[in-house]
């Protein structure tokens, strides 16, 4: 099967049954830890993943058997990915005891996940479509961007049905869409998905007030994204330059853990990007620390270890290993480019 530069087709179905699950598990652990039942592993396991790049998003249709899926804090620390994921099922389904607005996906419903947060779910035998959405594409459109992990979206909402139909159409036409089309479509898709998520709460006085603050929050997120690397960034300076009171700044960032934690998390996210970059001469931890706004490599290493339970050096080594294992094909010529795409979105 000939593949374009924006399509990756991965399958284990051509392998002996005894090897299929291990090869699949080794590949998909670039994003999830998976397990299945011994009988399935021994007798009936199969898996294919057909992925397309569309602008900055990845669209992947996967067909496989019953499995248990987990994204642990260790996995999050190891891979540094913070994308959003949206799932639609052609057949089969997914359940989770940790779901919001439900524990099981409805026919034509959707499941939204945040890769920066832990996840546990179970799928039946399934055929699904997954959109991997880079955080910057969607985050500023959401009222509460950290509050939707494992949110089940009901097809009773007409906007959910519209988004589901658009997902099917985009996947069906991905190979024919031009770059300029992709840019327009991904932004339209993000707007429609944000409308679904922002209306998922139901109206209360609390959520109405939060929605009234969305423009201010968008301004705050943009400001911190542009200024987090300044070592002299303080709540007082940020409030003054944003033109809001310090108490208002603290209030709006309370759900993000406060001003200092929000700033630290942005710095650590940028540090992960720098540590993931492959160069002939890796940058020193001191240089990475200063570029990200930390006062010293000591404070950087301490913050990284406290947050991710590993050192920046350990993270960089894990990233180098992951990239070597996803360089385009495995030892048998299997197409694993989708793994690299996940790390580089």
What kind of feature is each model-predicted range?
Residues 301:
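DNA-recognition helix of C2H2 zinc fingers
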Residues 55-57, 64-70, 74-95:
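Glycine- and acidic-residue-biased ligand/ion/polar-headgroup-sensing regions
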Residues 1-48, 57, 93-246, 253-260, ...:
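Alpha-helical bundle regulatory/interaction domains
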């Amino acid at each position: 099967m000939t593949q374009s530069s924006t399509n990756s087709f991965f399958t284990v179905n051509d392998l002996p049954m005894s090897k299929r699950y291990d090869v699949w598990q080794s590949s998909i652990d670039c994003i999830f830890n998976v397990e299945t039942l011994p009988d399935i592993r021994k007798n009936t396991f199969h898996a294919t993943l057909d992925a397309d790049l569309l602008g900055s998003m990845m669209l992947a249709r996967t067909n496989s058997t019953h499995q248990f899926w987990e994204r642990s804090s260790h996995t999050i620390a190891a891979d540094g990915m913070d994308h959003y994921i949206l799932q639609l099922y052609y057949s089969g389904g997914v359940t989770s005891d940790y779901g919001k607005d439900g524990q099981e996906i409805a026919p034509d419903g959707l499941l939204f996940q945040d890769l920066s947060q832990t996840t546990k779910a179970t799928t039946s035998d399934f055929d699904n479509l997954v959109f991997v959405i880079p955080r910057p594409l969607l985050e500023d459109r959401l009222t509460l961007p950290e509050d939707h992990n494992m949110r089940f979206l009901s097809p009773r909402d007409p906007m959910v049905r519209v988004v589901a139909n658009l997902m099917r159409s985009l996947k069906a036409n991905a190979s024919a869409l031009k770059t300029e089309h992709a840019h327009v479509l991904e932004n339209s898709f993000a707007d429609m998905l944000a409308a679904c998520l922002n209306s998922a709460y139901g109206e209360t006085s609390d959520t109405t007030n939060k929605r009234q603050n969305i423009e201010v929050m968008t301004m705050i997120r943009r400001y911190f994204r542009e200024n987090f690397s300044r070592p002299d960034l303080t709540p007082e300076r940020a409030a003054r330059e944003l033109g809001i009171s310090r108490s208002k700044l603290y209030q709006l960032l309370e759900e993000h853990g406060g001003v200092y934690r929000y700033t630290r998390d942005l710095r650590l996210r940028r540090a992960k990007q720098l540590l993931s970059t492959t160069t002939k001469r890796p940058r020193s931890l001191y240089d990475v620390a200063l570029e990200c706004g930390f006062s010293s490599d000591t404070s950087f290493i301490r913050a990284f270890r406290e947050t991710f339970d590993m050192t920046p050096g350990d993270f960089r080594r894990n990233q180098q290993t992951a990239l070597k294992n996803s360089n385009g094909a495995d030892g048998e010529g299997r197409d694993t480019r989708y793994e690299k795409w996940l790390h580089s979105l």
